[in-house]
Amino acid sequence: MENAVFVSEFFNLGDELERLGVFDAVINTDSPFFINVLRLKQTTVPELSHSYEKINAFFSDIMRLLCASQEKGDRMYREALRRFDFSGVNGINLGFSESGVDAGFGRILSQKVIGDAYDIVKAGSTQPEIFQLVGLFEENVAADRLSDMIATLIKEDIINYTRRINEQLSLNESTYPQITFV
């Protein structure tokens, strides 16, 4: 991470992020870290305390659609595929993107994952957590893409957390008028 600029450096925060237990992200490139869904299950961060349930609720809906599907390509299957739309979430700066734009899941990879999920459902499993294991049964799906998927589902929670931390640190348009804050 040559020439990496950390949030703490950019805003001259000293050790405030560490004191608050906040990740000191690199702002000009991705940090090689990922969202760990199992940590979300146990988090005490208020804004993220329901994120794990939100993720499972989303995938439970996908599983219900696949259960109701009679064959690959029918209406219920297509609806599951339509909902399984995960472009990368820009701005959280996690993963391995060199361009700063996260890849997420493309159409072909989404079709493959939903096709495999359909086969798993038809074999008898309807647990939404199966999507947390997608990297084990699908090529080209590693922690980076899984993290993008999770970030897409909990984006609002991440934004709310960021707003609270920004408020605690007085990071806003008043103190930094040259920056647009979310």
Place the predicted regions along the sequence by residue.
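Long, contiguous, compositionally biased segments that the model treats as domain-scale units
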Residues: 2-172
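Conserved nucleotidyltransferase catalytic core and NTase-mimicking acidic/glycine-rich helix/loop elements
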Residues: 177
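Interfaces and regulatory segments of ATP-dependent nucleotide/adenylate/phosphodiester-chemistry enzymes
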Residues: 182
